[in-house]
Structure formats: C-alpha cells, structure tokens
Amino acid sequence: MAHIYRLLLLLLSNLWFSTAAQNQSETEWPLHDNGLSKVVQWDHYSFQVNGQRIFIFSGEFHYWRIPVPELWRDILEKVKATGFTAFAFYSSWAYHAPNNSTVDFSTGARDITPIFELAKELGMYMIVRPGPYVNAEASAGGFPLWLMTGEYGSLRNDDPRYTAAWTPYFANMSQITSKYQVTDGHNTLVYQIENEYGQQWIGDPKNRNPNKTAVAYMELLEASARENGITVPLTSNDPNMNSKSWGSDWSNAGGNVDVAGLDSYPSCWTCDVSQCTSTNGEYVPYKVIDYYDYFQEVQPTLPSFMPEFQGGSYNPWAGPEGGCPQDTSAEFANLFYRWNIGQRVTAMSLYMLYGGTNWGAIAAPVTATSYDYSAPISEDRSIGAKYSETKLLALFTRTAKDLTMTEAIGNGTQYTTNTAVRAFELRNPQTNAGFYVTFHTDTTVGGNQAFKLHVNTSVGALTVPKNEGLIQLNGHQSKIIVTDFTLGKRTLLYSTAEVLTYAVFENRPTLVLWVPTGESGEFAIKGAKSGKVENGDGCSGIKFKREKDYLVVNFSQAKGLSVLRLDNGVRVVLLDKAAAYRFWAPALTDDPNVQETETVLVHGPYLVRSASISKTTLALRGDSVEKTTLEIFAPHSVRKITWNGKEVQTSHTPYGSLKATLAAPPDIKLPALTSWRSNDSLPERLPSYDDSGPAWIEANHMTTSNPSPPATFPVLYADEYGFHNGVRLWRGYFNGSASGVFLNIQGGSAFGWSAWLNGHFLDSHLGTATTSQANKTLTFPSSILNPTENVLLIVHDDTGHDQTTGALNPRGILEARLLSNDTSSPPPEFTHWRLAGTAGGESNLDPIRGVFNEDGLFAERMGWHLPGFDDSAWTSENSATSASSALSFTGATVRFFRSVVPLNIPAGLDVSISFVLSTPTAAPKGYRAQLFVNGYQYGRYNPHIGNQVVFPVPPGILDYQGDNTIGLAVWAQTEEGAGIQVDWKVNYVADSSLSVAGFGKGLRPGWTEERLKFA
C-alpha cells in the first residue's frame, strides 16, 4: 500500500505548487491506531482522541529544573492560559537514580505524580519523554553519572550491561505513567522512546540499510514500555531531516514507533549560532525551512508532528548577559509558528516553554546556571511579549477546529496583489474552510508590505479587503486569513483581521478579532444584514456594507477594545495587539479539546489562570500586577464575579459585559544583606591536614573501563571513585626532590583548576568558555620542597559531562607527571593519591536536594551551606547596612561567606526574587563563586568567563516566611584574591491565587552532626 500513498502524495504535491482551486476532492487516508486501543488514533491530518481531532500545541518544561512541586502548578497554569492543549516534559534518569541500586520517585521533588494530576485537573494532554537519554543541555544528557565509567559499554545500544542499567529506571517511569494514560481516562497522550536517536540506518537512509544494534535497542525500549503498562502511542523525534528514522511510512526495518516526529531549531538552539551551521547552513535571521516536502516524503500517512520546535535558545558560557532573546523574540514566535501552520503541521511542542535553572551540577558544559532559554515563560516565572504573542496563535489553534484537517492547495505570490508577499492555502476537504497563511516572499526581509488577497469562499472567488484598505505585513510578521470559519451556527465568510478566539453564549457567538495597533481590517459575516457599534474604544472608520448573502464590516483599530453587534446575533470584539495581549479565554472544562460553549472571555489582567461557574457566580483565578480594569464576556446567567476567592464589585455594560476593578498589589521591600560571617574553606592545602577520614578515598586503580585511558597511573578519573559533581580535591604524595609537575586535567568547557604544594600556591588554569582540557607545567620552588614527604593539592571543578557520544569523556587528571632537573636518574613518582568529592559520594547523604546539589569543597562537606549550622565563631565581615554586600579577601584560597536573613512575604501574593552577583570595578576577577540558598546551590558565577550575573531563586527554595541561610563559596585562583558584590531584588509582585508564602516546607532540611565526619 505504501506505493499507492506515495502516488497520492505526488498528486498532492503537484497541487501544492500550483494555483489554488476552490474545491478539492477528499483523499481517503488510512486511520491508524497501535492495536492496543482506539482511544488515540491518527492519520495524514492530525491526532484524534475518542474520535475528535485536536490541534496539539504544546510546550516543554522540566520539573527537575524547578525543584519546588508547588510551583509546577504555576508553570502549568500559565501554559494552559495560553490556549495550549498539551505540555511535554523530559524525565531525568540522573535525577532519580543517585546510584546503580536506587530509583527514587518519592522523595521531595522526585515525586512526579502531581504533574500527572495537574494535567487532568487543568485539562492538558501530556507528551511524556522518559529517555533514558534526553540531552536537554543536562550533564551527560540526563544519564546518571555513575554510568560514565565505561563499565556499562558505549551506551545507547543493546549492550546487556547498559540494558541492565536503564531497565529499573525506565520500568519505574513507565509504571508511573501507565496510571495516567488517555486510554484510561487520564491525560498522557503519547510516550516518547529515547531522544533524537536518528540511528536507524547505516549510511544514506535512502538505501534503507538497517543499523541492527540501534534497531535492537529501540525494540528493547518499546518492549519495556509495553511490559510496564504503556498503551498510548509510542513516538520518536528525529534530530534533523537527514536521519529519517523510526517511521513506518519510510520502512518496516524494525524498531519503528507508532508516530515519528521531527525536531527543528531554525534560528539555532544556542546563542552561539555558529554551532548550528552544519544542520541549518549559514545563519540568516528569519530564514525559514520547508517541512511540508519532508513530511510528505517520509511520513505521508501520519500527522506532521514536531516534538521539538524552537521556543528559544540556551546561553553558552561567555554568551551575552541575559541570553539572546532578540534571536527568538515575539516576532520570531509570530512568524515561525505560523510558518509551521502554513506547512500543515498540526502537532508541535515548543522547546522550551519554561526553561528553569541549572541548579547544582545539573548542566552539561555547554551552559551556565541559567536555563532561561529565552522561553515564553522566563526563568523567574514572569510572562511578557513573547508569551503573549504565542498565546495569540495558541488560542486561535484551540478554537479553529477545521484546522485539524486540511490539505495544502497551493502557495505563492499569485494569491496576492504584491509580489513581495506570498500565501499558503490550506483547505478542509470536508467543510471547505480555508486558511491563507501570509508571509513576506523573503521572510528575512522585515519591511512593511501592503496587499490584497485572492481567496476562494462559499460565495465564490473574492479579493479582500473588498471595500477599502489593505492587509499589512509590518516587520517580521505573518497573518492567517480565514474563510468560511465556523462560529457555532454562524459563519465568518472571511476576515483580514486575525481570529483570536470565539465563544458561544446562549447560542450567540462572540467573535474576537485583532490587528496590530493602528491597522485596519475587514470581515464578512454570512446571514447578517446590518450592524451597530456598541463600544468604539479606539476604533474608527467603522462601516457596514450589505452584500447579497453577507455583511461586510470595515474598521481601523487604535489602542483599546471595541464591540460591534450584528443583526443575526453575532457580537464582535475588536482588539489592537496590546489589548489582545491582555485578553484571555479560560476554559470551563477539564477536556483539553475545549468547545466554544465551554469558555468565558476576559480582558485586562496580567494573567487569568482559571474560570468556573457556579449558578450565578463566575469564579476567576489569576494575577494582577497593577491596578487593572477587568472586563468579562460570559453567559447572561452570571451576576457575580469573584477574583481569587473574593467578590469584586461589578457593573454591567450596555453591550452585555461585566466590568470590575482590581487593585494593585503592595510593594515588597527586601531586607539588607548584612551580618555576613566567613571562614577559610581550603584547609586541605596545608601539609598538616589529615586526609585519612571518610571524606577521602584512595585513588589507586591501575586499570579503567573508560575508552580513553590516562597517560599516567593510577587512574585519576573522579567518576571511577564515585565522585561525580563539580569541585574535587586531589592530594598527591611524593618523596624527595622534584623540579615540577606536568598536569593535564579535563573538566568540560569553562572548567578550572588550581594547585598548591605543601600549602604554597603554585598556579591556576582560570578557564575559558571553550576550553575543556588544560595542561600546565608547574615549577616547584626549592624553598617549599621537603626532603621527605611532599603533598600536591589539586582543586579542579568540572562543568558537567558532555552530551551524546562525548558522555564518557573522563573528568579528572589525564596526566600527572613529576619532573626533575637531574637527568642522571628517573624523576620521582607519586607514591599515592587521595581524592575527596561530594560528602558521602553516591550514598546520597541529602536525598531531598539530591546528589547533584553539592561539590567536594570543605564547606559543603561540612554542611556550612545548610540551615542551622552554627557559625558564631567565624569572622564577622561587618558589611555596610545597605541592600548589598561587598565581600573580599586576598590570597589564593577558598573562603565561605554566610548570612541568615529573614523574610516575611504576605499571603495572597506571588513574589519573584533574584540574587545579583557582580565584581567591583577595581576587584580581581580571577575567581569562581557558588551561591547557596537554604542549602541549594543556585548559582555559579565565573566573572572572568561568563556573563550571568542575575540568579533567580524560587519561593520554596527561599523561605518567604522565615529565616534564609545565604552562602557564598568563593575560590580565588590567584594571589590577588577575590572581591564580590551581593545584591538581591524583587522581579515582580502579583496579587495572585498562587500564594507562595509557605511553599517548600520539607524541602529545606537542616544541618546535622553527621557532616562533621567529612572534614
């Protein structure tokens, strides 16, 4: 049958590149299911749930990058408020498996059942992506770091050692998910196997020569998922258009999933766009990619599905401060997401919708602490223009039911009266509804182009606007012009203004249209004969012209909201873009496929989280950040409005809406960061230091399973000894004289190291944004050498394990070779090495925060960063009584600073707080600093490398109604020492249903005496 579908595809392609015809015969595409259930089905057009088609507009968030479960509601309510029908998340094997005998889905933020329950409550489908490999700019791509020794093979294959390693985690994840599937009335829609594993073929995929190892691996994963209760469709995501893996339309070679998908980052997944040239070619802003031909060639009988489409980009070390939001701005969201619709995509998930924070040692070396990703929801949880721009399209796709079943009829400049503008015509073969997606012919050009559009409608061919004005594309912009758009029992014949949404109250539709501020629009409603202006806020030039079967309305909309009423019962709300940004359509149902009778319309607030109606009362939950006028379009039965549980005084407008005023939230002032104390955190540099305690391990392996053996022995790879994160300390002993040492150390991009001999500082590798391995020859001054035993201390950090095939790249000392000026005899050798890292190693001493939270610094091993530690004997820093602290010291060492600061944030507010770290102008920059908040490492600040200075810390990590322990570990890599300025600030205050005061109880365990043994 495949050749028949490809023949049909060829015929469709001819239509696609030809001038549009009004009608197209409907092609009979096969309807697929996975043989286990018919609840979820799919075909050439879209996914279906219980026989209903749905446009899947989804966005990614990572629960492990915001380890406060109460805040998952905040993120997911903001996702729902955009109009998204789904969300996606990677699970992290590493986050749940601190060692090879533990899988933890119950402790603290590792219990993910609230996510599944929220999906059901809020009414969104889930795309669950368990890995076992996820990439995600996570250390080792989400693999647990105990897997990095080489003893489990080369990974991501059918090696029995690797299979035995991933099976417990993957089985647990599948079993948890199995309780929350669409097939059982819950909300998991699909289950992704592996991640960007485009390895099905050896050589050119067109030759279809299967990679049997990769096929066997995928079949093992699929079997495990099914054996552990997964009945929803299994999916995959190709990393690019070249690999063509795991789709049954392409081949039946083995290992195929039910629905294959394609990932795409047309503007580059990182702020360093040079990293994407091998995939995307030369970077040209706003250059688009053709996906239609790919999907028609590779999976013509499946939906055009993009499990990852660019929602932003991560900021690498030394990237611009604050990332590169200009690369994936609101304009990007406007153009590229509409482009996908023009390409007939009906299922796409934005990566990321909320990025979060690489707290602790979660990150791969490619990025620093922030994982803001320039996503629509910022790292500090605020929403802005990009979020609002995304919402304009998501609400449209939720309400445009005919968009879930379209054929591509044609594209080109022949649709317009301006050759600088082209259009793509999509048409529903059953209803004849049309969607004309318009762009600049050259999308990289952002000028202002005006045009008319040739469309086919149920009343014949028209050129619109008919009466006056032109359609405008101003800047990097796209517009979707609809024809024969269903409004309940009415029909929008066409509109040059974009549809935001519509609702039906008492069998009468309320249509919401928007245009950029100051632009004009024209629309036509079938069956209407006359109309009137009921509210003309900002609207001018309104004209009604009756045609034979429809009424044409022209308008120009400045700032504001206007309301028109037509004689056939249609109410039309006209918005400019600014007003549309503050317009919401909260659902009254927990069904993700929201119908037009199951929503209300709200204008004004910063955020509307939810709505429900009980008798005559409409209960709204949301956020207000300023004094706001609330306007509501709802059923006539609604007489009272509550906002966050409190009734608000309302008034009725002549055109049927309700209005109320929301007060501004109070200002929040943070207390001063003063009363700092400090202590030395590098006693290990001293010869008198005793390293015989349980914090230290003898590093004595003479063989390794790692595929990259060291140049000298013993093996000094930290992972071999169970220490996987950040800073590690090596003490190498030797007897007699040596003139120096050659050291070659590997720790990932932006890593650094320092060395001391017998307590005397030698030198450091400060690190660069791109250097992952650094060697130096250090000279030993004869004055500090002992004739007998000498101790060389090496302190090095790493910035995480590399991703994909680089995951096994070792972290530690690749070569340590003593040197001698005496050429008559061999140079001395190290007698033995001792190693210290995270307190307890893989034993997971702090299961709430987890093994990624701590490094091996003395301060961390001793628990100085934890609440409740007694620092009364420490040195007082006597900071100035202001909202900042300047902390400094001289000498190459590590010093730990600590302060306890109370907060008393009132209930009923959502407050976001960030720390700001900076280096005073005259202070040295050759240092590394780590920020700790109530025991959590929430910032890595390297002023000589990276540009991140703002570190958001969420409520729940911060105690908003109690004392907060703030710590700074500062590692000076030169004798000049270090100077650091510490501030904090309020990002926003919202009167909110999300009352964050009191969040995080149980997430901030305190200091215990057990820490003392790790000195």
UniProtKB/Swiss-Prot annotation:
Its main location: secreted. One of its GO terms (biological process) is galactose catabolic process. It is found in: Secreted. Residues 1-20 form the signal peptide. GO terms for molecular function: beta-galactosidase activity. Keywords: Carbohydrate metabolism, Disulfide bond, Glycoprotein, Glycosidase, Hydrolase, Polysaccharide degradation, Secreted, Signal. The active site is at E196 (proton donor), E308 (nucleophile). This is Probable beta-galactosidase B. It comes from Aspergillus fumigatus (strain ATCC MYA-4609 / CBS 101355 / FGSC A1100 / Af293) (Neosartorya fumigata).
